[in-house]
């Protein structure tokens, strides 16, 4: 069963948006999308709060998420996390009909 992870990045002075833009421009987003088990990896900007970016990240199963977290890709992401922002998130199984998912 697919697992969707919603991550909300909030910062100041455009830091969350800059992080998402660098993830995309550096090719990191494309590399994550190419990982085995990744079904979706998309950033969305908020109309209500220009300092907030939403990442919708979907994986085939927990094993795919675990492989991603254990991969060298995580070091690439950590290196880009020099931006000042906060991250909140939650995960939902694909059959979950909760409004937040």
Regions found by a protein language model. Name each.
Residues 2-10, 40-70:
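Short, well-ordered beta-strand segments in beta-rich or mixed alpha/beta enzyme
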Residues 7-15, 21, 44-48, 97-100:
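Short low-complexity stretches enriched in small and charged residues
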Residues 15-39, 73-78:
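Short amphipathic alpha-helical segments
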Residues 24-28, 60-63, 73-76, 87, ...:
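Short, low-complexity, polar/charged sequence segments that are solvent-exposed and flexible
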Residues 40-51, 75-101:
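Glycine-rich beta-strand-turn "strand-cap" elements at beta-sheet edges
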């Amino acid at each position: 069963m697919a697992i969707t992870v919603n991550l909300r990045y909030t910062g100041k002075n455009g830091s969350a948006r800059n992080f998402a833009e660098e993830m995309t421009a550096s090719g990191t987003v494309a590399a994550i999308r190419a990982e085995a088990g990744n079904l979706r990896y998309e950033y969305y900007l908020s109309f209500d709060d220009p300092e907030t970016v939403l990442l919708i990240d979907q994986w085939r199963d927990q094993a795919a998420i675990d492989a991603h977290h254990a991969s060298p890709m995580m070091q690439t992401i950590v290196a880009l996390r020099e931006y000042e922002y906060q991250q909140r998130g939650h995960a939902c199984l694909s059959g979950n009909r909760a409004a937040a998912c």
